[in-house]
Amino acid sequence: MAIITAAQAKAYIPTLSASSSTDDALLVTLTSRFDAVAAAHLGYVRQSAGAFSIESGTYIEYLDGPGGRELHLSAKPVTAIGSIYDDPDAEYTSDELIASADYTLYGIEGLVMLDTTGADTYFSTAHRAIKATYTAGYS
């Protein structure tokens, strides 16, 4: 799904006819290119599909363990967390999966905060210890 449809773009460009489909392909191309440029400018990482986009999509990030209770994800707003692993050995087995009940997501900020009452109360500090799979972007 595009950030804006060809019909919506035509409503803002008075010289284009709303009933004509001649410019639709061009508008779709321009919209998708703008989406990629905007996402790169805003610091988004590539989605799992390989493209830069501010549209909602799946992200898989391998992050250095920040230590402490806070994990900052690159793409925002985060709308769902698929999984978060904290594994200094970078194997990301089920034993290293952080239970969703053990953290709180602040989606607009892209912040994951470990709860003090969970099994995991601090992130490790190893290189690429964190594997986060999540959905972020605008729909």
Regions found by a protein language model. Name each.
Residues 1-139:
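Divalent metal-cofactor coordination and adjacent catalytic microenvironments
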